[in-house]
From Swiss-Prot:
Location(s) in or outside the cell: Mitochondrion inner membrane
Residues that hold heme b b562 according to the record: H84, H183
Keywords attached to this entry: Electron transport, Heme, Iron, Membrane, Metal-binding, Mitochondrion, Mitochondrion inner membrane, Respiratory chain, Transmembrane, Transmembrane helix, Transport, Ubiquinone
Organism classification: Eukaryota, Metazoa, Chordata, Craniata, Vertebrata
Organism in which the protein naturally occurs: Alca torda
Keyword hit for Metal-binding: yes
Function: Component of the ubiquinol-cytochrome c reductase complex (complex III or cytochrome b-c1 complex) that is part of the mitochondrial respiratory chain. The b-c1 complex mediates electron transfer from ubiquinol to cytochrome c. Contributes to the generation of a proton gradient across the mitochondrial membrane that is then used for ATP synthesis.
Name recorded for this polypeptide: Cytochrome b
Further facts: Heme 1 (or BL or b562) is low-potential and absorbs at about 562 nm, and heme 2 (or BH or b566) is high-potential and absorbs at about 566 nm.
Pfam families attached to this UniProt entry: Cytochrom_B_C (PF00032), Cytochrome_B (PF00033)
Any one Gene Ontology cellular component term annotated for this protein: mitochondrial inner membrane
Annotated a ubiquinone binding sites: H202
Amino acid sequence: MAPNLRKSHPLLKLINNSLIDLPTPSNISAWWNFGSLLGICLLTQILTGLLLATHYTADTTLAFSSVAHTCRNVQYGWLIRNLHANGASFFFICIYLHIGRGFYYGSYLNKETWNTGVILLLALMATAFVGYVLPWGQMSFWGATVITNLFSAIPYIGQTLVEWAWGGFSVDNPTLTRFFALHFLLPFMIAGLALIHLTFLHESGSNNPLGILSNCDKIPFHPYFSLKDILGFIIMFLPLTTLALFSPNLLGDPENFTPANPLVTPPHIKPEWYFLFAYAILRSIPNKLGGVLALAASVLVLFLAPLLHKSKQRAMTFRPFSQFLFWTLAANLFILTWVGSQPVEHPFIIIGQLASLTYFTILLLLFPIAGALENKMLNY
């Protein structure tokens, strides 16, 4: 009998073991769709990004008009740009839901997979930030100025570090050039990291909604979950294309339709919606270095998730206290996102401070306590 090519060929074998004959728990829900959706997001962003890069000029005098030229004169340039800009939003929606799923079902106990995932999140945030600077509108310029300036809070080396990153004494042409280089490079690094993420995942196999070992009940990935993933793609592409075609600027900032002007500061400097929760945490601390540390901690705290797991059960499926805390945390993140979009005045300052305190308290203190308490409840 001739050997099956997809099982014997060195390259096809890799694809086969990852996407076709992969043993998958039979009971994974739609929450497990977001990994493949993130892969599709990445491919879409790389494709639209490459097409945009062919028409973009990384120069302060030409960047803004080159983007306008792409939208006006290039065949379907407006569509490519709208898909790329809104695709970033969908990328973040998917990654936040993916992380939320991992948190709820205890997937962070696969430590290597979880840690590479957090590094992926940081890489994605860096990519989105440098990408937002490229159109060289007002919010691009001032966003770059404000966020890069945060590094000056680092004692002793801060100011030198910022000027080194800028390539001068302010955000200018060298900054734009290197940000374009970084924005081009990082997605390919993300793709590489995603492969490492998958390699670690396939070492242990997928978790499932019950948080228990599922070796006794696995089914092949194809056709069951490949088909389910295609449904997921359709469900994601519908709102993405709807947004890109009907209301492409809904999530953007009107300030960015004005070319960058170092002499005029916008009334409210704020990042895109997907960074607002972290921005709110940054602003809630009146000290510069303290704010920067809190901003870093807001994402880096995810690395501690495996260490703070005190429950005997993996998933939160049968843990009511942890469930309550989880959904409180989700609501709290919405509040932080909203506060981040508001001006720095009463009552938003105090709301932001309380929400920031709640965020860290739930993650670092209440989750371990709830886990230990639920262990006690198992005895009754």
